Regions:
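Conserved active-site carboxylates
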Residues: 2-9, 17-32, 56-133, 152, ...
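Histidine-centered divalent metal-coordination motifs
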Residues: 4-6, 38-39, 157, 437, ...
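Active-site-adjacent beta->alpha loops and helix N-cap segments on the catalytic face
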Residues: 15-18, 40-50, 135-143
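A generic structural signal for well-ordered alpha-helical segments
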Residues: 25, 51, 143-145, 218, ...
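Noncatalytic, beta-rich nucleic-acid-contacting surfaces in large DNA/RNA-processing enzymes
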Residues: 32-35, 51-54, 191, 239-706
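Short, ordered loop/turn segments at secondary-structure junctions
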Residues: 38, 63-64, 156, 308
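Acidic, metal-coordinating catalytic cores used for nucleic-acid/nucleotide bond scission
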Residues: 38-43, 133-137, 157-160, 377-381, ...
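Short acidic/histidine-rich active-site segments
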Residues: 149-162, 305-308, 437
């Protein structure tokens, strides 16, 4: 019966999170619920999961509004209907095609008009929504004639009286005006909250046809989504078999180039990886990334493949990455294994000068109907919250500055400030606007509008209306297309050297720069200003303290400079142990066995996982939850808490003293959000060497381009 519910994804309008909306429905024993946020489908997948987990039938839809005017409410009969709604919104958002006020072209969508927008005739799938406070209008013959096409309309926008005031504040923020200057059409009615279903039906007891029509709409709507199947582009060629053949061919061609002599260990690694990639149906993902890199090479662009993808020998052989996994003992399983159900995640950097050309190629090659950026929700932040709420209350700039710049305890005597603070606290974590993910591109098999409406931000590339977490959950894994200045400096320097000196440098051949003698001399004394990632005062100081004179030490340095390691005290300890390898004791025997290469210090994500598994006795899946939390990819605090609880339970069972277990977990936690995987550090170290080589041997050209 509740066919028009808003969550806080109705930006600067709704006040209820999807979780709270479903929980409130559960409290009222409501068995069917429709989420119809204003012009967006952002929340429908979280809504679906929460509803089905609580035995509530979910209905997906959208409320179509242009400014303050409600055109109609769209309710999808099925998954096809969601796609039809998405395409209506996409045409408006991206192509500027005006949304029709009546009779949008739908085959699998119910349309509910408000009384204020009734067309001259209604199609079979179109109805009129009538609110309980509008029932008395049915005495008018002009409306009474439509009763046979009416349904119950009870919008839901807020939960409590306090949230109703918050709704008004949001509307004032949206209109950039004062709360007192809002007109009635700017905000919702004070009845727009969930109520007991029986009480609602009682209001319509004298219009049984309206109740019956509502039941018909509810029964004919079905939102059923398969989260388990991959939604990415399935094949690079025309079939899986040809993808397998092409990837194998490219891998062996690259193998012969990367390793000139016969190399049975490398060949065995390639075979092992190809078997896993084929079994998991990820050949297309590798080939699409290879194709993008091929285009980049053809255009003469520099790129760096980094992240966990650099653990892969196949990635190395086909040119996506440039570090040898065997040299650094990098585990392919860290990137891809048979327990992983989602596609791998390649991170590839280009120069900021070339990134747009790469993006344009992707959209052109794979089709605008199948490519879009991930979206991201920009939330209200602390200072901006109080500025925005304060403006809605009419505070002048000086008071806004004071409000945002001082702790609340210093404003206790100001009643308006206390009110602003009260409502501002409610807005924490509320989405304020949608924006473009910095680098995540989605390439889908089916039209991407089957899953989301698209929006067109100022950057000029379309975005989906959900974030990367939702994308991954529904089966869309992103390609990370990043940019940085360092690659542009290297490319420009190489071109300038050729122009001025007539010397061609194959800077992509890492053998000429990595562990080069003179480069290592510069490295060990921190003479690295202008060089990628190793030019900051902190990094130059670290290089000097480590007396860093080779690639492997630079790889470690690239990771221990991160805030998590430094703040935990482990960076200082690593420096001591590196310079005094016989003057320390390992924290525990497990640390000596698993972390001997890094002197018993957790430096990389892999090291943290090793300790969690071998000291804490966690399972591999729990280790992956921990890894994802550390890399910022996890969003389930409850899942992380379960892993933490299990860690301490397991440590107790293994006989570890409680104090020891707490200290180990403290070290693990200090890495959260900051630690690098080893392959990522190695990729950065290669680029550092490339820029250092140019600085050492061609300083004038390098400094001109830096």
């Amino acid at each position: 019966m509740f066919l028009n519910c808003h969550s806080y994804h109705s930006l600067r309008y709704g006040t209820i999170s999807v979780e709270d909306l479903v929980q409130q429905a559960l409290d009222y024993n409501i068995k069917t619920l429709a989420l119809t946020d204003i012009n967006t489908v952002t929340g429908i997948y979280d809504f679906y999961k929460l509803c089905t987990a609580n035995n509530i039938k979910p209905i997906a839809g959208v409320e179509i509004r242009i400014e303050n005017e409600l055109y109609y409410i769209c309710l999808a009969k099925n998954q096809k209907g969601i796609g039809e709604i998405n395409r209506l919104l996409t045409a408006y958002n991206c192509d500027g095609i005006e949304i029709p006020k009546h009779h949008p072209t739908f085959e699998n969508v119910f349309v509910l008009y408000p009384l204020q927008n009734i067309p001259e005739k209604l199609l079979d799938h179109e109805f009129i929504g009538i609110r309980q406070d509008e029932l008395n209008l049915l005495i008018q013959p002009a409306l009474k004639k439509w009763v046979h096409k009416m349904v119950i309309l009870h919008p839901v926008t807020f939960k409590t009286a306090e949230e109703y005031e918050l709704h008004k504040i949001l509307r004032a923020i949206d209109h950039n005006t004062l709360i007192t200057k809002l007109s009635e059409g700017d905000y919702c009615k004070d009845t727009e909250t969930l109520v007991n279903k029986k009480l609602l039906l009682n209001k319509y007891q004298y219009e049984p046809q309206i109740i019956e029509n509502t039941k018909i709409v509810v029964n004919e709507c079905s939102f059923d989504f398969d989260f388990s199947t991959p939604k990415n582009k399935k094949h690079f060629t025309e079939s899986k078999e040809n993808d397998v053949k092409l990837l194998r061919q490219l891998a062996y061609e690259g193998l012969s180039k990367r390793y000139t002599a016969d190399h049975p260990q490398a060949q065995a690694r390639v075979e092992k990886e190809l078997a896993v990639i084929e079994k998991l149906n990820f050949c297309a993902y590798f080939l699409i990334t290879w194709d993008i890199v091929q285009y980049s090479d053809h255009m003469g662009f520099m790129h760096v493949g980094r992240g966990s993808g650099a653990n892969s020998m196949v990635s190395y052989c086909i040119g996506i990455t440039d570090i040898c996994p065997l040299e650094l003992d990098l585990y392919f399983e860290r990137f891809l294994n048979l327990n992983r159900k989602t596609p791998p995640d390649f991170d590839v950097d280009w120069s900021w000068q070339n990134r747009d050309a790469i993006l344009e190629y992707i959209f052109r090659k794979y089709g605008k109907d199948h490519v879009a950026f991930c979206g991201t929700n920009v939330e209200f932040k602390y200072k901006s919250i109080f500025r925005e709420v304060g403006k809605a209350f009419g505070l002048p700039k000086e008071e806004l500055d004071a409000l945002a710049g001082k702790p609340m305890t210093q404003h206790d005597d100001n009643s308006v400030f206390r009110l602003v603070h009260q409502y501002g606290k409610l807005l924490e974590k509320y989405p304020n606007q949608r924006s473009m993910h910095s680098c995540g591109i989605l390439i889908s098999e089916e039209p991407i509008t089957n899953y989301s409406a698209l929006e067109m931000p100022p950057k000029g590339f379309p975005i989906v209306q959900f974030d990367m977490h939702t994308a991954e959950e529904i089966g869309l894994e992103k390609f990370d297309i990043l940019s940085q200045r360092g690659l542009g400096t290297i490319k420009d320097t190489v071109e300038l050297i050729k122009e001025k000196r007539g010397i061609t440098i194959d800077i992509k051949d890492t053998a000429i720069s990595k562990d080069e003698t003179k480069c290592n001399e510069f490295l060990s004394i921190g003479k690295t200003i202008g060089c990628f990632y190793i030019e900051s005062p902190a990094m130059r100081g670290l290089l000097r303290r480590l007396k860093c004179d080779n690639y492997k030490v630079l790889v470690a340095a690239s990771s221990i400079i991160r805030p998590g390691v430094a703040q935990s005290g482990m960076m200082k300890e690593y420096i001591f142990r590196h310079n005094n390898p016989t003057k320390f004791e390992y924290f525990h025997e497990v640390f000596k066995k698993e972390l001997g290469e890094t002197y018993g210090i957790m430096v990389y994500q892999e090291d943290v996982i090793k300790i969690a598994l071998h000291f804490g006795g966690l399972s591999a899946p729990d280790g992956d939850v921990l890894r994802r939390a550390m890399s910022g990819k996890g969003r389930s605090l409850s899942a992380l808490q379960k892993v933490k609880d299990h860690f301490f339970e397991s440590c107790k069972e293994l006989g570890h003293p409680e104090g020891l277990s707490k200290e180990v977990y403290r070290q693990i936690e200090s890495f959260a959000g900051y630690s690098f995987c080893k392959a990522h550090s190695a990729s950065y170290a290669v680029e550092s060497y490339q820029s250092l080589y140019l600085k050492v041997y061609y300083p004038i050209e390098f400094m001109v381009c830096a």
